Amino acid sequence: MLKIDGLTKSFGSGSDKLHVLKGIDLELNRGELVALMGPSGCGKSTLLNIIGGLLPADGGEIKLQKRTYGLKGPSSVVDLRRDLVGWIFQDFHLLNNLSALDNVAMALELSGTNSTEAEQLAAEALTKVGLEDRMHHIPDQLSGGQQQRVAIARAIAGNRPLLLADEPTGNLDIASGKEVLQLFKDLCHDDEKPISILMVTHDPELASSADRMLLLRDGKTEASDIRSAWGLDKEQDGEEE
């Protein structure tokens, strides 16, 4: 569903040039929840920004369904962001004066969907995330976990096949974080329209509950587990020596 080959990205120039991504190879299957971990500043958010069409790479290629991209700027991949990729952040970015339904519908209307269809798609998305009885509530009337569910509904409305989640539980308590993770699993394993989720997180419990975990380190990704993601294997090796 998503395939990345040899993706590279640097910032700066000359002696100050910083090579952040050094040949990323990554695959994400349909209906799969993958956690991406790594030390702060290793390029996790940079990678998500490139996959999401917000930042061009220096080299390499991305294939998402039938779309090939990666090296062009955001203005060249507007359709990608509109039709194929949804975003979730730790901040909900909801408009406080609008209901949950209107928050989701407005995002669809801004991408070109007519108001009648936008409202229908918004209602379907909110139902899918378990907020069918909270559609007409404004954000202040919702818990933190419910607000994040509205943000998730906004991201998946219109049947986007890929969801990029950057620290999605960062502002939630433990219980709400677990609810969001379970929702992610339900969305990925949906019998009719499964989506794929690439989730950046520093939470080891969250990461270990994903279908698969990747570690971004030294500019490349590799299959991982919790011990290696936190550097515990290296510590153990040092003790044995």
Give a label for each model feature.
Residues K220-E241:
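Conserved beta-strand-loop-alpha-helix hinge in the C-terminal portion
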Residues M1-S209, M213-L216:
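ABC family nucleotide-binding domain
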